[in-house]
Amino acid sequence: MKTFTAKPETVKREWFVVDAAGQTLGRLATEIASRLRGKHKPEYTPHVDTGDYIVVINAEQIRVTGAKSSDKMYYSHSGFPGGIKEINFEKLIAKAPERVIETAVKGMLPKNPLGRDMYRKLKVYAGAAHPHTAQQPQELKI
């Protein structure tokens, strides 16, 4: 029997909606990253993007354990000398709640062109409303 490898043109992708309200950041991000890669499917192939589309709602209600809400730092750099910026979890969740989940998931995906394609299938929204009702996403319990 020959080994099966998925072809990019035959991959069937589904849309799922995940409610992040009350979920722990890391546990939610690992499951999302796994589904974006397609590792939950029997036809998973490492060099082919077999993952599904994931829509995350209520990103502003995500939680972290312990003192991470004040201690967890996010860093960015402008590229200029002395241009490092830092912001903690509390301030980032108030300023841009989508970025918290996006950053966590992006760090769990491959750092190559295939990983960037997988990351583009992630849609994160701060509130409960999202513009993807036409795709008829199924609810995913995590």
From Swiss-Prot:
SUPFAM superfamilies: Ribosomal protein L13 (SSF52161). Keywords: Ribonucleoprotein, Ribosomal protein. One of its GO terms (biological process) is translation. GO terms for molecular function: mRNA binding; structural constituent of ribosome. InterPro entries: Ribosomal_uL13, Ribosomal_uL13_bac-type, Ribosomal_uL13_CS, Ribosomal_uL13_sf. GO terms for cellular component: cytosolic large ribosomal subunit. Pfam families: Ribosomal_L13. It comes from the Bacteria. This protein is one of the early assembly proteins of the 50S ribosomal subunit, although it is not seen to bind rRNA by itself. It is important during the early stages of 50S assembly. Belongs to the universal ribosomal protein uL13 family. Part of the 50S ribosomal subunit. NCBIfam families: rplM_bact. This is Large ribosomal subunit protein uL13.
